[in-house]
Amino acid sequence: MWLCNTPTTNVAKACNLPEPAQGGWLISVSDELEHRKDVEFIFVLPTSKAIEGISYVEKDRSTYITLNLKNSSDETMIHAFGTVLNRIKPDIIHIWGTEYKHSWAMTKAAEQSEMSEKVVVSIQGLVGMIAKHYMGGIPGKYQLLPSFRDIVRKDTLKKQRDDLIRRGEYEKETLKSVKHVIGRTFWDKACVGLINPEVNYHFNNETLRETFYTSVWKYENCEKHSIFISQSHYPIKGFHYLLEAVAMLKDSYEDINVYISGYDNALKTGILSTAYGKYVQYLIKKYDLSSRLHYLGMLNAEEMKQQFLKSEIFVSPSVIENSPNSLGEAMILGMPIVAANVGGVSSMLVHGKEGYLYQSDAPYLLAYYISQLFDDRENEYELGKNAREHALRTHNKEKNIRELIDIYKNITEER
């Protein structure tokens, strides 16, 4: 049984929910499990978009369960999950992510139902750790002075960080209460080990969205001196650092352009602007960069892939990450890459062999490595080729699903 915070395509269709805009990597893994004859697949989704209460939808050998738990108390949430557990009686309770309260509630429900030994938690991001880096590189002025939009929505930078800290407390309780976690980087292993030194850590790499396995980046087909980033809308994605790097490069590369996918919060102006957006707008104006920035909006998997292939370099300027899927996607396409050396990124990419890693708060280093790629086509090709070879091993679909099932078997046999 899986507990997730976003539906797969199959779940969305069966439960009349909107198509998922995120979590495409979950689709790849769930599809593999649903096609196996030796697996009965149960998918549990807390969502305010479902009908009230608990709903069960059966399709073939799968069961999709939605719970509308909006504004529910902790006790109500735990009771709802307990109801599901006692009806389904799963062999494995696989919780994807620790970022949300429902993960904590499921562990409590499992404890009350005497099923704690069946629980395994996959590490995605670790919000308690992310909170420590949330304001990285943001001047105090913009941290302390909320925008009009922030005041109206009660959504200041400080509140965003405080919310991560609060969720981090539930996260700690979740990790302290489980015997098994699944991770994939030295960073998540270290963070989990600090919280629960006795936990059994199982290694399992992620599988990417299907479309990224079928294409390869080519210099001849890209827009020269173009950079692609996958997100920019909140501080930890480090867009402000990229702007400073581009400012250092624009005179040397007059045709440099940056393409940005995802939410556009950081680019909105006027009363819609966030405090972080105001800082971004200040940098754009200061360095005269507006004509070089191109916002693409939310892209589906195929559109993302095409933008990767059209761009000369992929940059991941985040101030903290575990193992960003966008980096894996760029690697498996064989792109030239520059990424901030934060969190678990160095578990994915080898500096100088598969791309370049740099100190996250040093935009001058980011600018330097971008120029190293722009100026050396052969180096771009060699780094991209090595990155692709590494990513094909890391994101091997058959190997990853086999190892995941082995983890499930080991947990069940241990009991």
Q: Model-flagged regions — what are they?
A:
Residues 272-299:
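Nucleotide-activated donor-binding/catalytic signature segment of Leloir-type glycosyltransferases, i.e.
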Residues 1-52, 58-62, 114-115:
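N-terminal subdomain of nucleotide-sugar transferases
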Residues 336-339:
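Short hydrophobic beta-strand element within catalytic cores of glycosyltransferases
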Residues 127, 143-180, 190, 194, ...:
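Membrane-proximal helix-turn-helix segments that form the acceptor-binding/catalytic region
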Residues 351-352, 356-363, 372-378:
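Conserved acidic donor-binding segment of nucleotide-sugar-dependent glycosyltransferases
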Residues 319:
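Aromatic "clamp/platform" in nucleotide-sugar-dependent glycosyltransferases that forms part
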